[in-house]
A protein has these predicted regions:
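N-terminal hydrophobic targeting segments that direct proteins to the cell envelope
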Residues: 1-15
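Solvent-exposed soluble domains appended to multi-pass membrane proteins
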Residues: 12-24, 29-32, 37-389
Length: 389
């Protein structure tokens, strides 16, 4: 029947993504604060390459660009989309999920991996009360949480703990794992947090725009450059370990910079934009790298809510029912966020209410499933949303 054929088509398309490491890999996620590639908005020139190492990583990774649902702020919404596979598309504008909608143990990559025997660790080198994470992380099912007091607070760039210090902590936790411990680490960095207007004695800014004078943009790009060096340190370490390791890296949202900078990129600024131009501001780079699989897969457009499904597939882990639904949905709806979705039939971005035909069917079913997962306490589908064991 048609559904079975649809599943076969989806399975064949994602054969490139799936890999079999032979044993359960360590899975490390880095959601990098304000990490973005501003060239998606428009062209500009700098004195040096902003992220040379990131650009070199593509050869043995799934890589590309993903839609975020937020611009310049509200990090936890990206965190939530990644972990749960849910989308801000179906929640009221301006929502912050962690402060409004988290229930006890929602189905997520945390509960799925925990049910699969993983130890689940959350790391965030900032205050535990930020966005109520100290309450939310235990609800999500994390076994361990590490906040600012667990990090070396002398390792600062400007006034935030460095990516390098976060990565050293990740490596320490990996090296101290028990003999048969399967490890999942979800980390959220702080180094590149806005704003970018103050000058700091502890930060030698290496990147500068050519032909344009925007000190905040220079500082931001210099921070991304520092992130790039730290990333090389992290990947170089895990390239040389024998056990299988997967690293998922993505930005949570683009930075908030001088509004007068944007006309230099897109010719218009931040207003009067087409839907496609607006979505450029919600686009962040990502990769999923492993030390056991060398195939390169380029995904020119996806969205943060799909990344955990891609990560589970690449890790060789059998997809839970909800993630299988998302893997199938990607074939028709390659990207979706709070603004709209990428329509293959239209060849561009549309608002959700503009969807027709098969695209509308997928979006409607996704909305129904997400509502069931988040709000339907009595009739929650245990097929799609098994409880934490």
């Amino acid at each position: 029947d048609g559904k079975k054929q649809g599943e076969k088509d989806a399975a064949s398309a994602y054969a490139d993504v799936a890999a079999d490491p032979g044993e359960k890999p360590t899975i490390i996620v880095v959601m990098s604060e304000s990490y973005a590639d501003l060239s998606v908005v428009g062209d500009f020139s700098t004195n040096i390459d902003v992220a040379p190492y990131f650009h070199s990583l593509k050869e043995n990774a799934i890589h590309g660009y993903a839609l975020s649902s937020v611009f310049g702020a509200k990090t936890p919404n990206s965190e939530w989309e990644f972990m749960t596979g849910n989308s801000m598309a179906f929640l009221p504008s301006g929502s912050v999920v962690y402060q409004q909608y988290i229930s006890k143990t929602p189905t997520s990559i945390v509960s799925n991996l925990k049910n699969d025997g993983y130890t689940c660790v959350a790391m965030h080198p900032y205050y535990e009360t930020g966005w109520s994470r100290n309450a939310v992380y235990p609800d999500l099912g994390f076994d361990e949480t590490h906040f600012i007091d667990d990090f070396d607070q002398t390792k600062l760039l400007r006034e935030y703990i460095t990516d390098r210090e976060l990565y050293e902590k990740i490596i320490d936790r990996y090296e101290s794992r028990a003999a048969n411990e399967d490890l999942f680490i979800m980390s959220i960095s702080m180094q590149n947090h806005g704003g970018y207007t103050e000058k700091y004695d502890n930060f030698d800014e290496k990147v500068r725009l050519l032909g344009l004078n925007y000190p905040d943009v220079n500082q931001y790009l210099s921070l991304v450059h520092e992130s790039d060096s730290a990333l090389e340190y992290l990947i170089s370490y895990f390239q040389n370990v024998e056990d299988p390791v997967e690293i998922v890296f993505f930005g949570d949202h683009q930075p908030s910079l001088s509004s007068s900078f944007y006309p230099n990129l897109n010719g218009k600024g931040l207003s009067g934009l087409t839907e496609d131009e607006l979505e450029d501001l919600y686009t962040i780079p990502f990769f999923i790298w492993t030390n056991y699989e060398s195939t390169e897969v380029e995904l020119p457009i996806t969205s943060i809510n799909y990344l955990s499904t891609l990560a589970l597939e690449r890790a060789g882990i059998e997809l839970p029912a909800y993630n299988q639904f998302l893997a199938d949905m990607m074939e028709t709806i390659p990207a979706i966020n709070s603004r709209g979705y990428y329509s293959k039939s239209a060849g561009g971005f549309l608002h959700i209410e503009e969807a027709t035909g098969e695209e509308a069917d997928w979006i409607r079913n996704y909305n129904i499933l997400q509502y069931n997962n988040m709000f339907d306490k009595k009739e929650k589908s245990e097929v799609f949303f098994p409880y934490l064991k």
